Every structure is written in C-alpha cells, then in structure tokens.
C-alpha cells in the first residue's frame, strides 16, 4: 500500500490566511501548481493576469514579502509562509475605494485595454513602498519588465509620476 504524503502550506494573501494541502490526491494542490493559478483559480483573484506564462511580460506581478514577483514563475508550495498582495489587496477592503496609485491610473488614463495594468501597478507599488519619491528614470527602470501590447507605457509612467507629485503636495500640507 502506497503511503501518501501531504504537506500543508499557508499563504497570507491580501491580509487573509489560507491553508492548502499539497499532494497528489483529489482536491489537493499539485506540487507543480504556480502561484498565479492558485490566486486566480483557487482564490478567485482574477486581477492577477496570466500573460506569457514565462515570467517575461509582468502581467502576473504580485508583491510577495515586499518585493514584486512574477507569480507565473513561483511554485505555490515554495511560497509557504509568504505574505502576498494582489491588485485587489491595494483597494480598501471595507469600502472598495481604490488606493492612490490605482486612482492615478484612472485619472491619468494609464491604461488602454487594461490587461497589463494590474502588473504595472503592482510593480510601481512595490517601488513606491521602498522609495516613495523615485525619479522618472527609476520609475521607467522599475517598469521595464512590464510589457504593454497597446503601447501605453508612457501613460503608465505619467500616472505614477502624477501620483508621486500628489503625494509630495500632500506631505507639504
């Protein structure tokens, strides 16, 4: 008789803890499951987009333990104990009000079709969490791994820079 081994992992996603059984049995998470599939398919967080599935486009970017990561390249079982924030986790959970960076993208048309936008915003948010006043060059460099097929890179950068200026003004008051 084959003895099954099941590992239990815990993720904290958008402030909420989740446990998953990793194994080969029915209802268990396969060891090969990537974080993007766990977030989208198991947790219903469809703001995380699956683009290239090779870590090249940035559409699946989330913040894990304070750093932007491409969730299509992370095995979920390797994320045990991690704190993860998705695009859904930036908005106020009680009211649904967008955070300032998300609102800046709306106000300054930092998107076109919107498919890449969550990954771009998450990458920018991770940068701003580390450096609240980056230069435009630093913003462009941070976003260089996020691709937009519609060509809205310039409006994405403009949106981030507008948000930074807004934050500077609010700090002066």
Predicted regions and their residues:
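Signature of N-terminal electron-transfer/Fe-S-associated modules in redox systems
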Residues: 1-173
């Amino acid at each position: 008789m084959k003895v099954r081994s099941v590992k239990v992992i815990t993720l904290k996603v958008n402030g909420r803890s989740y446990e998953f059984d990793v194994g080969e049995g029915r209802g268990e998470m396969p060891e090969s499951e990537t974080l993007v599939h766990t977030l989208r398919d198991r947790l219903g967080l469809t703001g995380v987009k699956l683009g290239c599935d090779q870590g090249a486009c940035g559409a699946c970017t989330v913040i894990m333990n304070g750093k932007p990561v491409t969730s299509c390249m992370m095995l979920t079982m390797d994320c045990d104990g991690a704190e993860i924030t998705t695009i859904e986790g930036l908005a106020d959970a009680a009211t649904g009000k967008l955070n300032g960076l998300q609102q800046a993208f709306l106000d300054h048309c930092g998107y076109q079709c919107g498919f890449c936008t969550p990954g771009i915003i998450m990458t920018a948010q991770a940068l701003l969490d580390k450096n609240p006043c980056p230069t435009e060059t630093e913003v462009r460099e941070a976003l260089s791994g996020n691709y937009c097929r519609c060509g809205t890179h310039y409006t994405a950068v403009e949106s981030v820079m507008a948000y930074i200026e807004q934050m500077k003004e609010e700090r002066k008051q």
